[in-house]
Each structure stands twice: as structure tokens, then as C-alpha cells.
């Protein structure tokens, strides 16, 4: 049976994700104690009901969250279940704003401030985050974008044979993407921003792309980076990962990182992988 565990930070969009999966035909249950995971799955199997899978929501509200959660995952996988763990996150600033908009207390402790609650929650969920199949950063998403991302993740990534790589360009000025598995800094390359004829254009413009890719250091970097990815991706597959997010950053996320992201993605596609490209800050830089 396919099992999707939804977890992550309060205010990061877990409820929206659950509703999206219910619409896709998954049976969803919220705040189930970890010790009951396997028994619940067995009951669903015996019921004879037809579902695409089961969604189990667990977060800081669970009293037994810190004891046995990773072991529970291993147990479910050991008896043949396809288990995915989706961890939803967002920047502290975004989470604080969302709590202010809803006027809710933070569930970590009703007596603490929201920022303190977020800090406590991050500590308690650290092991879950480390064992996630996929981390989804919802900081920049609206409700519709979040639903789309969840559906794409569920429909697109189902095992190492369909390993998916998302290559994201970003600007360090706006922060590192929270869901990045690998982060590469390409600020060592010459910056088209200081070439007046190139400054107005992004790294998708042929002239800017040519400027970046024809630098001697660029060729060497791409060769070394691609060799590293050829080593890492099979290792991720062996560990049961089905999704890798590579974040490539420059100062503003408009020129160098965009060109390098597209060049990296083109090389990865030659390996037969599913590759997605996104340029987070291309309109900001």
C-alpha cells in the first residue's frame, strides 16, 4: 500500500496538502499516534475499500512524536509498503506572518510567543525533517501553487526508477531555498550585471548565457559539478530517495545562477532523469 506521511511546521500548509490528496482519492487521517501507524494501515487493508493510498498526518501535536517515529517508518517499509514522507516548511518570517493573519497561538506551547514556538518546533521536528523523502518550502506559494506542487510530487515521484531532479536558481540576497538538498554558489564567476549591455537581461537571454558559459572557470565548474552529480544521484537512489533539489545561487538570482541552472539541467537530462527547472528570483534580481 502507498503511504504518504504529511508532516512539518505549523502554518506551512499541511492542511491544504491534505485536502489536495483527499481530492486525489487518498484516505487521510490527522494526528494519529505514531504507535498506531501500522495497525491503522492493516485495518485499511482488511477493510477492502479502494483508495489510492493512505495519508497520515503527524506533527508537533503528537505526544509520542519524538519516540519511535523513524523506527515506525522502517517497520512499514520492511513489510512492503511504499512510504513517502513529505515535510512542509517555510521561512520563520513567513510563518510568523501567517500566525499573525490567523491570530492563532503556536501549538508548541500556548504560553510562548510565536517566534519561540517556531524555534521549539524546529528542534522537535529535526529528526523528521532529516528523514523526509521530500521537503517542500511553501514560503513563496499561494494555495493553488501549493496544491499543484503536492499533486506533482505525488504523481511524479514514485521510486528511484523515476528519480526527479529540480534545479532552482536563486539569489543569496533573498535567502537560500529551504528545500534544497545541495546548494552551489556561483558568485565566483564574472558578473554580467557589470556589463552595461547585459545588465537589463536575465540568464535566459542568449547573449547573457553566452557570456556566462564561455568563461574558462564555467566550463571547469560544470564538468566537476556534473561528475559529482553522477556519483551522488545513484547513491540517493540506493537510499530510497526519489527527489533531489539542487539550488544554484548568485548575488541576485538573475544572471549567473539562471544560466548555470539551465546548463546543469541540460546535462542531467542526458542521464535520462526527469528534470525540472525553476528560477525563484529571476524577476527580483
Swiss-Prot record:
Signal peptide: none annotated. GO terms for molecular function: ATP binding; GTP binding. Keywords: ATP-binding, GTP-binding, Nucleotide-binding. InterPro entries: P-loop_NTPase (IPR027417), RapZ-like (IPR005337), RapZ-like_N (IPR053930), RapZ_C (IPR053931). Gene3D superfamilies: P-loop containing nucleotide triphosphate hydrolases. The keyword Metal-binding does not apply. Pfam families: PapZ_C, RapZ-like_N. GTP binds at residues 59-62. It comes from the Bacteria. ATP binds at residues 8-15. Disulfide bonds: none annotated. The keyword Transferase does not apply. Displays ATPase and GTPase activities. Belongs to the RapZ-like family. This is Nucleotide-binding protein Glov_2163. It comes from Trichlorobacter lovleyi (strain ATCC BAA-1151 / DSM 17278 / SZ).
Amino acid at each position: 500500500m502507498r503511504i504518504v506521511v504529511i508532516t512539518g511546521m505549523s502554518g506551512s500548509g499541511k492542511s491544504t496538502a491534505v485536502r489536495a490528496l483527499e481530492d486525489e482519492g487518498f484516505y487521510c487521517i490527522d494526528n494519529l499516534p505514531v504507535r498506531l501507524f501500522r495497525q491503522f494501515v492493516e485495518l485499511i487493508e482488511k477493510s477492502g475499500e479502494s483508495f489510492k493510498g493512505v495519508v497520515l498526518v503527524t506533527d508537533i501535536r503528537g505526544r509520542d512524536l519524538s519516540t519511535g517515529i523513524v523506527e515506525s517508518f522502517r517497520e512499514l517499509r520492511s513489510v512492503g509498503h511504499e512510504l513517502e514522507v513529505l515535510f512542509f516548511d517555510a521561512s520563520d518570517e513567513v510563518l510568523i506572518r501567517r500566525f499573525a493573519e490567523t491570530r492563532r497561538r503556536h501549538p508548541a506551547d500556548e504560553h510562548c510567543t510565536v517566534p519561540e514556538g517556531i524555534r521549539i518546533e524546529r528542534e522537535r521536528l529535526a529528526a523528521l525533517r532529516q528523514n523526509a523523502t521530500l521537503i517542500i518550502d511553501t514560503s513563496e506559494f499561494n494555495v493553488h501553487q501549493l496544491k499543484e506542487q503536492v499533486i506533482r510530487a505525488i504523481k511524479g515521484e514514485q521510486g528511484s526508477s523515476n528519480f526527479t531532479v529540480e534545479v532552482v536558481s536563486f539569489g543569496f540576497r533573498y535567502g537560500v531555498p529551504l528545500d534544497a538538498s545541495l546548494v552551489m554558489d556561483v558568485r565566483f564567476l564574472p558578473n554580467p550585471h557589470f556589463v552595461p549591455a547585459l545588465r537589463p537581461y536575465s540568464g535566459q537571454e542568449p547573449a547573457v548565457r553566452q557570456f556566462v558559459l564561455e568563461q574558462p572557470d564555467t566550463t571547469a565548474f560544470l564538468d566537476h559539478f556534473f561528475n559529482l552529480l553522477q556519483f551522488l544521484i545513484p547513491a540517493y537512489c540506493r537510499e530510497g530517495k526519489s527527489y533531489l533539489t539542487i539550488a544554484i545561487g548568485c548575488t541576485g538570482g538573475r544572471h549567473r545562477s539562471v544560466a548555470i541552472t539551465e546548463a546543469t539541467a541540460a546535462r542531467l537530462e542526458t542521464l535520462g532523469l526527469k528534470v525540472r527547472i525553476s528560477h525563484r528570483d529571476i524577476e527580483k534580481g
